């Protein structure tokens, strides 16, 4: 190829890369559990001069006591040991899967359950959800990381997972706190005794014991999103994953679809008191198994706050979805696919949108209005609304 043409191609490639958002540049990032990198084990991070200091170091760009925080205060460090208690033993017995702490279906989310070939010399499955379960196998990036001369971008290029990016963090967290195309907590697993899964990205990020500090140095090296943006991205991705699961699992071979994707309270409620009341946003009467639309509700409100016409359109499509559950399964899956596609479009939209004070005010007004209209009478809707208010006011 002539040199002048090659130079033009290089310039074009550089220009194209410069126009991409961080989200687009990280688009091909593989979740830590599914990458080919070797996971070296928690102890590779736990040295007293690495991340195992008993207290934060003064003058360091990081706290240095991250391992201690995780080990003592973070529930992720106890995720494996939960599989050894009597409740988990009974669940495993109910499911007929052998021992819970040996079953892949349990280990996939209660531990850093990478393939045997990707486990280093001191790796221990009993460490639970450890460092590399979230930050990625350290085979390629750990040496750079401890060298003191590599940039954060160098580490990312070598396989460090970008947890600071809200989109990638949502994909990571949701892979266990909801599920992905390889693992999911089904209604059968819940029937065996597993608790209901709930999740909201910004709230769960804030309530996890922080082993980092968002200071000047952090801002210089990493992506920082505000609470409302993180919340909005989390809602869109959670809905996308729910519809992807619905479309993949479809009708499970029996007469029912996968019920874990529907609202638990539609069936699991007291029969001693009459609590049902109509919800305007569903168009449904009593006795119907409702699709869990809690993320849809939040997205309607977010969109109404920044793009009123699109928000109203989403509201109408939500009613279409609910009505189709009682009339036509083909129509139900058609609307579900359309809503899945829309949720996917909203992720980059929210990533690039600059949420400001006026957006927060509009959103709070919309939330209050929907509350008065009894849209949050369902537990899951009220739960997401409360976490949303906390996120946008933080």
Locations of regions flagged by a protein language model:
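N-terminal secretory signal peptides that target proteins for export/translocation
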Residues: 1-7
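Bacterial N-terminal signal peptides
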Residues: 11-22
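Short N-terminal segments immediately surrounding and downstream of signal-peptide cleavage
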Residues: 27-48
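Primarily the internal scaffold of c-type cytochrome electron-transfer domains
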Residues: 28-33, 54-93, 122-129, 137-390
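Aromatic-flanked redox-active Cys/Sec active sites in thiol-based oxidoreductases
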Residues: 42, 47, 111, 128, ...
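Cys/His/Pro-rich metal-binding microdomains
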Residues: 43-51, 107, 132, 174, ...
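Post-signal peptide N-terminal segment of secreted/secretory-pathway proteins
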Residues: 92-132
């Amino acid at each position: 190829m002539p040199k002048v043409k090659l130079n033009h191609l290089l310039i074009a490639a550089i220009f194209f890369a410069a126009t991409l958002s961080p989200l687009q540049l990280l688009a091909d990032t593989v979740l830590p559990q599914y990458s080919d990198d070797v996971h070296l084990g928690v102890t590779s991070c736990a040295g007293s001069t690495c991340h195992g200091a008993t207290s934060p170091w003064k003058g360091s760009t990081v706290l240095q006591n991250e391992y201690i925080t995780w080990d003592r205060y973070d529930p992720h460090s106890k995720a494996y040991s939960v599989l050894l208690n009597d409740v988990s033993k009974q669940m495993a017995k109910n499911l007929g899967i052998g021992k819970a702490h040996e079953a892949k279906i349990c280990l996939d989310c209660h531990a850093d359950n990478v393939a045997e070939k990707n486990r280093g010399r001191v790796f221990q499955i009993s460490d639970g959800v450890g460092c590399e379960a979230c930050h990625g196998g350290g085979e390629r990036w750990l040496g750079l990381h401890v060298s003191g001369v590599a940039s954060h971008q160098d580490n990312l290029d070598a396989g460090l997972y970008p947890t600071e990016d809200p989109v990638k963090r949502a994909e990571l967290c949701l892979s266990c706190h909801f599920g992905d195309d390889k693992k999911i907590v089904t209604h059968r697993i819940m029937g065996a005794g597993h608790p209901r899964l709930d999740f909201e990205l910004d709230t769960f990020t804030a309530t996890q014991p922080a082993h980092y500090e968002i200071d000047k140095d952090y801002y210089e090296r990493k992506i920082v999103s505000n609470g409302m943006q993180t919340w909005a991205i989390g809602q869109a991705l959670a809905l996308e994953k729910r519809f992807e699961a619905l479309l993949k699992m479809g009708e499970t071979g029996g007469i029912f679809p996968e019920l874990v994707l529907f609202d638990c309270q539609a069936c699991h409620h007291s029969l001693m008191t009459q609590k049902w009341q109509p919800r305007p946003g569903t168009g449904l009467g009593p006795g119907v198994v409702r699709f869990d639309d809690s993320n849809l509700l939040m997205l309607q409100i977010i969109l109404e706050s920044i793009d009123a016409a699109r928000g109203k359109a989403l509201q109408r499509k939500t009613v279409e979805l609910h009505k189709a559950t009682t009339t036509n399964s083909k129509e139900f899956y058609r609307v579900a696919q359309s809503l899945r596609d829309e949720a996917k479009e909203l992720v980059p939209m929210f990533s690039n949108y600059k949420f400001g004070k006026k957006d927060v005010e509009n959103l709070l007004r919309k939330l209050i209005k929907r509350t008065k209209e009894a849209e949050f009478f369902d537990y899951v809707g009220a739960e997401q609304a409360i976490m949303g208010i906390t996120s946008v006011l933080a």
